[in-house]
Amino acid sequence: MEGQVVGRVFRLFQRRLLQLRAGPPQDNSGEALKEPERAQEHSLPNFAGGQHFFEYLLVVSLKKKRSEDDYEPIITYQFPKRENLLRGQQEEEERLLKAIPLFCFPDGNEWASLTEYPRETFSFVLTNVDGSRKIGYCRRLLPAGPGPRLPKVYCIISCIGCFGLFSKILDEVEKRHQISMAVIYPFMQGLREAAFPAPGKTVTLKSFIPDSGTEFISLTRPLDSHLEHVDFSSLLHCLSFEQILQIFASAVLERKIIFLAEGLSTLSQCIHAAAALLYPFSWAHTYIPVVPESLLATVCCPTPFMVGVQMRFQQEVMDSPMEEVLLVNLCEGTFLMSVGDEKDILPPKLQDDILDSLGQGINELKTAEQINEHVSGPFVQFFVKIVGHYASYIKREANGQGHFQERSFCKALTSKTNRRFVKKFVKTQLFSLFIQEAEKSKNPPAGYFQQKILEYEEQKKQKKPREKTVK
């Protein structure tokens, strides 16, 4: 059974890779189903308030295979149970639910009962046939009880990227599961009926717990929603600013990047952080925060990918036929493999600007929000300086349809090194998808990136009179 599921998922993945060579849609090894009734944006963090928090809560446990010593992960609890689905919807749901256990236990099938196991919080991403993404928020731990036992995973499937919020929800699920599975149901039902809050807003849930009474649980969405799906702390802990900059440079040119780490939490947090550095652009290729053992062949793919692999599979990865890969050891803070030109991809002046900004006041930061803003800011500013003038080079027809003037856009940059870089960057899917959306919209989106563009243009206007006065 498991081999059939893995084979089906992998065939879907291979088919998606072939599609990628021909066009721009997103892909992922966890391509499990298509959901036609809900259209999603390319970038995970951009979700409006009013959506449901989640689609499923699942408990995934390890079950011993018949006549074998190995274990297989299976779903032992599901909320809600979907009924009255059309045949096509039912088939899609079945594919999704068969794929999820592989990502909850990506380590493989060799397990032994344990008396101690450090709890881990991690996430994975499943990409649908239509390019939209579902996120699995996971808490893996050893259930309460005497004697040796096997870990299990609580997994919340949602279309919303807000990791801090879902980590708190997993805390509440875990607390209730220690009492009884029956106590989880009313909490999750209340959560399912609540609308996901808009940025900066709070939703309060009323929940009863035996022996504790009624509790009120407040879930607040960060005001700055473009960073709510990420935590840069792990990336800063594992790597230097210079190394992060080289990873960013590789990602900007859509190369193959593999992260290695022992822990699932470290892997998923670091890969999400690396992808978030690309804002306002979205990684459009294979994206697997933690690769299941059965899908390790992903690292041999000829197309771009950004994946995380557990350290136990390091030798298998190293022995795989790979070309032009950046292989990052997060445990040691080293690059095990690289192309060799990572330091030369970005314009030197702009590289220095990023490093200077990252180094200023880093020790004074106290909260996760402050760290996120501090790390993300210099990379957003890089894109503002390099491509912030894009809207001026979209010419529109009478019907409002825009056409990007690529050549004039590149020529507008006065720096030769900036122009050289941009001529490469405009050929990426990162930029192509961004410009395609801009061509459809009559006005630039009033988001965080546009705000930074306007601030930068205002600074330039104020700088010109001062320069004339000095002369």
Swiss-Prot record:
The primary site where this protein sits is cytoplasm
Indicate the segments forming the dDENN domain, all copies.
Answer: 361-445
This protein's GO cellular component annotations are: cytosol; nucleoplasm
Q: Which residues form the cDENN domain?
A: 226-359
List residues of the uDENN domain. 55-204
Its annotated compartments are:
Cytoplasm
Question: GO molecular-function annotation terms?
Answer: guanyl-nucleotide exchange factor activity
| InterPro entries with a match to the protein in the record | cDENN_dom, dDENN_dom, DENN_C, DENN_domain_containing_2, Tripartite_DENN, uDENN_dom
Quote the tissue specificity entry.
In bronchial mucosa, mainly expressed in ciliated and basal epithelial cells and weakly in alveolar cells (at protein level). Tends to be down-regulated in lung cancers, immortalized bronchial epithelial cell lines and precancerous lesions.
- Matches recorded under Pfam families: dDENN, DENN, uDENN
- Print the keywords alphabetically: Cytoplasm, Guanine-nucleotide releasing factor
* Function as written in the Swiss-Prot or TrEMBL entry: Guanine nucleotide exchange factor (GEF) which may activate RAB9A and RAB9B. Promotes the exchange of GDP to GTP, converting inactive GDP-bound Rab proteins into their active GTP-bound form.
Q: What is this protein's name?
A: DENN domain-containing protein 2D
- Organism whose genome encodes this protein: Homo sapiens (Human)
